[in-house]
Amino acid sequence: MQPNDITFFQRFQNDILTGRKTITIRDASESHFKAGDVLRVGRFEDDGYFCTIEVTGTSTVTLDTLNEKHAQQENMSLDELKRVIAEIYPNQMQFYVIDFKCL
């Protein structure tokens, strides 16, 4: 079985598959992805494969510069997005936005 290239929490799987979630915000450990990369996607909880995505763009962002567009692309409110990012990456301010589409 091929390993997954990137994982998402299971709660985001349906939003990814239906196109409601089109970005992911990651820390420096996942800043190496670039436009054109094709990635196998798995669930964080069990590493089970659920789709393949293509990276369509990347950019940097800070917790303070997250905006409504980021929130819409994550399919959540801006307050919820900031809370989720702060929970996943405590004490970090610099992040990497990965834009993607399901293949």
UniProtKB/Swiss-Prot annotation:
EC numbers, comma separated: 3.5.1.135
Record SUPFAM superfamilies: PUA domain-like
Record-annotated ASCH domain positions: 6-100
Catalytic reactions on record: N(4)-acetylcytidine + H2O = cytidine + acetate + H(+); N(4)-acetyl-2'-deoxycytidine + H2O = 2'-deoxycytidine + acetate + H(+); N(4)-acetylcytosine + H2O = cytosine + acetate + H(+)
Domain of life of the organism encoding this protein: Bacteria
Keywords: Hydrolase
Active site as annotated: K21 (proton acceptor), T24 (nucleophile), E74 (proton donor)
CDD domains assigned: ASCH_yqfb_like (cd06552)
Cellular-component GO terms for this entry: cytosol
SMART domains: ASCH
Family: Belongs to the N(4)-acetylcytidine amidohydrolase family.
Function: Catalyzes the hydrolysis of N(4)-acetylcytidine (ac4C).
Protein name: N(4)-acetylcytidine amidohydrolase
